């Protein structure tokens, strides 16, 4: 609700954070119960909640054997993935892509698109390729890091076979393939992970944002074969894997695993595709509930966003001026989608 008491339909979800929506009662109870029992303890003690999260995650993970490291954000998760790749391979070059966003810390900003200010130096070399290119991957490359769908760039889908070609190139040259699933993971595409949506399994992947539905948590997954090459103590975190974050993430996984939950996400994504031709929308890109609506020439996404706000609907922007971004709670209702479609059809933009 707004400060004046007015209500809004949130179709942006805080950049894919509000997996279960605002003020989810079940999640609130889980967090309150955990706070009252144990809000924090040292990492020197075993914490059964971490094992419980692993058990909850395991059925939905990509094929293979995985280990996971807990931190507090997507940037941290990506930093840890890069550190693991550099150590496991002994190489010093990371391949990244134009349009990418991986975070604002030193290493993460180094592999983010050049339009975002970076730190003056980083402990590795970056080879930046055009989106969709597999040129430049050779025996000097430690890892290729990418978002399976580039969200901030404008919900840009990968070209056909691009991810499979990257997988083949990495295998050919002994480089690791890393997926940044900070936004595409946790059921967002109607599959638990983007690797399942695109049928390409990476050597490591990261997630955050919606992993604990608004409670700070970053996760770095790495295959057992890579993990066995890493020195003990390579990664560490004071708050990572704390009891509150673990409790929230377990609740998220419980909800995602419910029968028909992911099918519901897929169905809503298809329903939102009906926005094409409604008012200023000329195309819809993306998958599941990570979508970009392309706005017709002569109008901007910002104008449409502001006009929708007058209808009580919150949407988002991105780095593409003609793309309106949607990343709502996965608990969205079909009636909510109909409310958006009606509003688009009846918009007055730029008047």
Regions found by a protein language model. Name each.
Residues 1-351:
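Conserved N-terminal phosphate-binding loop of PLP-dependent enzymes in the Aspartate aminotransferase
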């Amino acid at each position: 609700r707004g400060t004046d008491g007015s209500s809004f339909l949130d179709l942006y979800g805080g950049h894919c954070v509000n997996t279960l929506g605002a003020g989810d009662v079940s999640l609130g109870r889980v967090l309150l119960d955990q706070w009252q029992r144990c809000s924090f303890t040292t990492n020197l003690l075993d914490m059964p909640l971490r094992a419980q999260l692993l058990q909850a995650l395991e059925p939905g993970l990509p094929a293979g054997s995985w280990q996971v490291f807990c931190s507090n954000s997507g940037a941290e998760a990506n930093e840890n993935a890069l550190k693991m790749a550099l150590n496991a391979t002994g190489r010093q070059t990371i391949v990244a892509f134009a349009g990418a966003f991986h975070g604002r810390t030193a290493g993460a900003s180094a592999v983010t698109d050049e339009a975002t200010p970076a730190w003056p130096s980083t402990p590795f070399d970056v080879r930046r390729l055009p989106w969709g290119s597999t040129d430049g991957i050779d025996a000097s490359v430690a890892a290729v890091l990418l978002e399976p769908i580039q969200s901030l760039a404008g919900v840009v889908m990968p070209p056909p076979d691009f991810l499979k070609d990257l997988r083949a190139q990495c295998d050919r040259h002994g480089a690791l393939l890393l997926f940044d699933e900070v936004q595409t993971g946790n059921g967002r595409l109607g599959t638990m992970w983007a690797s399942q949506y695109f049928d390409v399994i990476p050597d490591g992947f990261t997630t955050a944002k919606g992993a604990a539905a608004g409670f700070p948590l970053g996760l770095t997954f790495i295959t057992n074969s890579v993990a066995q090459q890493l020195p003990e103590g390579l990664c560490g975190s004071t708050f990572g894997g704390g009891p509150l974050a673990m409790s929230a993430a377990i609740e998220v996984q419980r909800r995602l695993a419910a029968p028909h939950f992911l099918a519901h996400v897929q169905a809503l994504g298809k329903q939102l595709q009906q926005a094409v031709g409604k008012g200023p929308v000329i195309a819809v890109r993306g998958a599941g509930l990570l979508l970009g609506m392309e706005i017709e020439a002569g109008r901007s996404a910002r104008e449409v966003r502001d006009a929708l706000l007058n209808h009580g609907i919150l949407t988002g922007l991105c780095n593409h001026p003609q793309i309106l971004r949607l990343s709502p709670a996965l608990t969205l209702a079909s009636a909510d989608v109909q409310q958006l479609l009606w509003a688009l059809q009846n918009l007055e933009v730029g008047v």
